[in-house]
From Swiss-Prot:
This is Organ-specific protein P4. To organ specific protein S2. Keywords: Repeat. Sequence repeats lie at residues 60-85, 86-111. Expressed in pods. It comes from the Eukaryota.
Amino acid sequence: MMSLRSAFALLPLFLFLIVANVESRKDVGEYWKLVMKDQDMPEEIQGLLDASNIKNSKTHAKENKGAIGEFEPCPNASAYGDNEIHANENKGAIGEFETRPNGSAYGDNEIGAEFTDDFEPRPSMTKYNA
């Protein structure tokens, strides 16, 4: 008798999950054109589909415009795997630049650094061992 009560308690949750996903595909017409090689959907089928274009903030992804404006990132020197990078090796490279470098090593100790004039980075050093 107790398992029947718990099943009835979970029933509204499962029904909500099913109903929430009913309108998962809004652009059925676009899918039809893609599959049918740019042929229009027949009028007989169009009447069967609900093609409302009402935007729901929960179902449509918001566009991320990225970073706008100036910001100061925190660069780091990172080493992954069996890289042998010591603090003594990096001191010479740091002294040669006006801005502090962002050096990263991946795989076979290939160290690359990219700089942008607008940034004033703060140094940090991270090493990940395998």
